[in-house]
């Protein structure tokens, strides 16, 4: 029996990244559906703070694909890239007359799925 490697995929997940999900979305929209060889170059020249954790996660997903499935990095494509909102860190900032204003610090969960490029 032959194993069909065309539909196999692997993923990498980063949770509780201390950056807003909307700021990460503008970065991951640029690499969705791209070849793995193109995606790190795109992230390198974008000037956003969210590029660093996304590029780390992308290299981790490629390492998972090469180790677990034996995929070549040249044959890999980012099939699914998504970001979800994580838990909100809630803090209070001291204000005048003994009051405190709530401060919400957002987190996000980033998922990158890599599969073999369809020929």
UniProtKB/Swiss-Prot annotation:
Q: What would be an example GO MF term here?
A: structural constituent of ribosome
**Which Pfam families does the UniProt record give?**
Ribosomal_L22
This protein's assembly is summarised as: Part of the 50S ribosomal subunit.
Sequence similarity = Belongs to the universal ribosomal protein uL22 family.
Q: Which organism is it from?
A: Anthoceros angustus (Hornwort)
Q: Which Gene3D superfamilies does the annotation name?
A: Ribosomal protein L22/L17 (3.90.470.10)
The answer, when asked if Cell division is one of the entry's keywords, is no
Name-wise, this protein is: Large ribosomal subunit protein uL22c
Q: What does this protein do?
A: This protein binds specifically to 23S rRNA. The globular domain of the protein is located near the polypeptide exit tunnel on the outside of the subunit, while an extended beta-hairpin is found that lines the wall of the exit tunnel in the center of the 70S ribosome.
Q: Name one GO biological process term.
A: translation
Subcellular location per UniProt equals: Plastid, Chloroplast
**What PANTHER family has UniProt attached to this entry?**
CHLOROPLAST 50S RIBOSOMAL PROTEIN L22-RELATED, LARGE RIBOSOMAL SUBUNIT PROTEIN UL22M
Q: Which NCBIfam families match?
A: rplV_bact
Q: Gene Ontology terms, cellular component aspect?
A: chloroplast; large ribosomal subunit
Q: Which UniProt keywords apply?
A: Chloroplast, Plastid, Ribonucleoprotein, Ribosomal protein, RNA-binding, rRNA-binding
């Amino acid at each position: 029996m032959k194993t069909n490697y065309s539909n196999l995929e692997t993923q990498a997940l980063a949770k509780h990244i201390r950056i807003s999900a909307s700021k990460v979305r503008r970065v991951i929209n640029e690499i969705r559906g791209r070849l793995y060889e193109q995606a790190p170059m795109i992230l390198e020249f974008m000037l956003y703070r969210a590029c660093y954790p996304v590029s780390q996660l992308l290299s981790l997903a490629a390492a998972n694909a090469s180790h677990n499935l034996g995929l070549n990095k040249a044959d890999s494509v980012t099939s699914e890239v998504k970001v979800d909102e994580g838990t909100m860190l809630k803090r209070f900032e001291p204000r005048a007359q003994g009051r405190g204003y709530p401060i919400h610090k957002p987190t996000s969960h980033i998922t990158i799925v890599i599969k073999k490029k369809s020929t």
